[in-house]
Amino acid sequence: MSQLTYLFRTAPHSHSSGREGVDALLAASAYCEAISVVFIGDGVYQLLAGQQTASILCKDYAPMFKLFDLYDIEHVYVCQQSLQQRGLTSEDLLIEVEVVDTAQLQGVLHNSAQLLSF
């Protein structure tokens, strides 16, 4: 079975790509079991707990990440270097993730048959 990987690289709420990525990911999970999700660069902010979106008049879609368990999305990776550069740890995130180094991240991306970037 081919591996489908969703790559989140952008900060939330600056444009709609994060929300669109989550929507696409949850929809694809109904048809594909081999899904990985990777958060790198500013994409790690997508998972940041405690986001307050009311003041910027944006819908808070961060709780949708908590649906990953319900949709059997088990392979969720966050770049260790990206977290460190932003002064974050896995405890700052909404959901449990596997924090991986650059070499491990390259392996995940290399094993992907399809890569969708948001």
From Swiss-Prot:
Cellular component GO terms, alphabetical: cytoplasm
Localization: Cytoplasm
A Pfam family the protein falls into: DsrE
Cytoplasm among keywords: yes
Record keyword Transcription regulation present: no
Job of this protein: Could be part of a sulfur-relay system.
Family to which the UniProt record says this protein belongs: Belongs to the DsrF/TusC family.
Protein's recorded name: Protein TusC homolog
Biological source species: Vibrio vulnificus (strain CMCP6)
Lineage of the organism: Bacteria, Pseudomonadati, Pseudomonadota, Gammaproteobacteria, Vibrionales
